[in-house]
């Protein structure tokens, strides 16, 4: 769908919420985008009598499904993690009004002086998430899914980025390495896995640091996965 049509739909939806949240519609401005078809906007308003900003997620329903984000936001909030709260939703249109965790990512804030405290907070949040884990809630990080993601290394890094074609021995060696990785991951303790727990998705916040974003693809899988992403 034409982005201008989406923006018109978004503005119409916000207009219906403007009274409830005291939204200043003319303040709407792009906030960020990600590797999907989702876009994010920031809009000024009032919550509980205090002036603050909100985030609007624009997720075209032809390509995106907001339901995992909504469900996992609630799940992670129950684990006392600092995630965007879903304040308003229109799943059919792919529009969400979210609480705003600010502009400062870990990536932009990291330096030798700030790193110890930021990573201490990130470790604590990760432990908190893992302690809240229960089987049967999130999709399993299955062998098939892990295998598909390992094969991205061959397809995108070796073949497309480095333009390398492996010979039969190299291919066999890499396949053996992948099997060792798979066996190790599947034998580990299984917990909630954010799956993208790194400095671009962690926000520096004054309270309950860090704010955690981009969790909609979370699964139930190996306990070391998010640590590897973080470090």
Feature annotation, model-predicted:
Residues 41-147, 152, 162, 186-187:
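ATP-binding pocket architecture of kinase catalytic cores
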Residues 191-192, 204-231:
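Active-site Asp-x-Gly
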Residues 196:
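Conserved catalytic-loop position in the HRD/HxD motif
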Residues 23-41:
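ATP-binding glycine-rich phosphate-binding loop
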Residues 33, 91-93, 218:
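Short glycine-enriched loops at secondary-structure junctions
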Residues 1-23:
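Juxta-kinase regulatory segment immediately upstream of eukaryotic protein kinase catalytic domains
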Residues 10, 16-19, 134-139, 145, ...:
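An alpha-helical support segment within catalytic cores of ATP-dependent transferases
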């Amino acid at each position: 769908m034409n982005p201008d049509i989406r923006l018109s739909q978004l503005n119409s939806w916000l207009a219906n919420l403007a009274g409830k949240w005291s939204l200043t519609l003319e303040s709407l401005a792009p906030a960020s985008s990600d590797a999907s078809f989702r876009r994010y906007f920031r809009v000024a308003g009032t919550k509980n009598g205090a002036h603050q900003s909100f985030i609007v997620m624009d997720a075209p329903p032809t390509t995106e499904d907001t339901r995992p984000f909504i469900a996992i936001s609630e799940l992670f909030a129950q684990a006392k993690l600092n995630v965007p709260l879903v304040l308003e939703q229109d799943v059919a249109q792919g529009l969400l009004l979210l609480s705003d965790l600010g502009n400062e990512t870990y990536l932009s804030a990291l330096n030798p002086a700030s790193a110890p405290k930021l990573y201490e907070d990130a470790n604590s949040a990760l432990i908190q998430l893992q302690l809240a884990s229960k089987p049967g809630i999130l999709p399993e990080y299955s062998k098939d899914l892990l295998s598909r993601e390992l094969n991205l290394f061959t397809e995108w890094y070796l073949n497309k980025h480095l333009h390398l074609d492996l010979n039969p021995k190299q291919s066999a060696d890499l396949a053996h390495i992948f099997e060792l990785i798979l066996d190790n991951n599947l034998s580990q303790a299984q917990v909630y896995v954010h799956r993208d727990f790194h400095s671009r998705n962690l926000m520096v916040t004054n309270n309950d640091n860090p704010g955690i974003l981009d969790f909609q693809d979370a699964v139930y899988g190996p306990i070391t996965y998010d640590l590897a992403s973080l470090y």
